[in-house]
């Protein structure tokens, strides 16, 4: 039997709700909140297997088996540009790294007003002369200077941007490619922004 959100909340108030009940309450409220969802929007509201593992664990440590499963699923999700080029144009990547555009929900419909951005600067320090930067993630200043721009580094960088969980399961890094927020071509531009010697990121 599936209960509506009010009934679930009332039941939960009688005793402290267990995690399963709390999850059911949250999922029911979210699903009932959108009266005219599109299939694309409904899909965005569903957690995939990796997200369910990470949400269930919370602040606890993953077991080796759980970590291995998340990594395996993440690696299987990675797709590469049709052109085969993992390094695009650093200038385009610069724009993407500072652009926070994304999908918008209007009247229950998921709409895209413009091409999505990556907004990397929200969590990372990028060019050394920038002031408004984030510190949630590690600094990326001098990324290419420290690592070089070999094919191996380009591939590693591409995959970490596409789905960081392939290397750090359940990390806070958004899975920009796996969630289709960015296209493979856009991610290739971000790779160039990080490793191209001419990029502001790699200026001394």
Model regions and ranges:
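Residue-level signal for mature regions of secreted extracellular proteins and peptides
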Residues: 6-7, 47, 113-116
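Short coil/linker segments at helix-helix boundaries
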Residues: 75, 103-116
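Residue-level signal for alpha-helical transmembrane segments in multi-pass membrane proteins
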Residues: 5-11, 128-131
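Post-cleavage N-terminal segment of exported redox proteins
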Residues: 8-104, 160, 193-204
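Extracytoplasmic electron-transfer domains, predominantly the class I c-type cytochrome c fold
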Residues: 20-21, 25-37, 41, 88-92, ...
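Non-cytosolic head/periplasmic domains of membrane-anchored proteins
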Residues: 97, 107-109, 126
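Bacterial N-terminal signal peptides that target proteins for export
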Residues: 1-3
């Amino acid at each position: 039997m599936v209960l509506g959100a009010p009934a679930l909340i009332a039941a939960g108030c009688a005793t402290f709700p267990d995690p399963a009940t709390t999850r059911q309450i949250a999922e029911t409220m979210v699903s009932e909140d959108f009266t005219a969802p599109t299939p694309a929007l409904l899909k965005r509201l569903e957690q995939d297997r990796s997200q369910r593992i990470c949400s269930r664990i919370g602040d606890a440590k993953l077991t080796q088996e759980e970590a291995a499963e998340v990594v395996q699923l993440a690696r299987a999700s990675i797709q590469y540009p049709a052109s085969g080029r993992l390094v695009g144009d650093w200038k385009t990547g610069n724009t993407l790294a500072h652009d926070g555009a994304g999908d918008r929900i209007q009247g229950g419909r998921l709409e895209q007003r413009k091409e999505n951005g990556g907004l990397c600067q929200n969590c990372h320090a990028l060019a050394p002369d920038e002031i408004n930067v984030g510190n949630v993630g590690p600094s990326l200043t001098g990324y290419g200077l420290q690592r070089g721009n070999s094919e191996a580094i380009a591939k590693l960088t591409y995959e970490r941007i596409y789905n960081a969980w392939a290397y750090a399961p359940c990390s806070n890094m958004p899975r920009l490619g796996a969630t289709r927020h960015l296209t493979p071509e856009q991610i290739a531009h971000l790779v160039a922004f990080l490793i191209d010697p001419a990029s502001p990121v790699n200026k001394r």
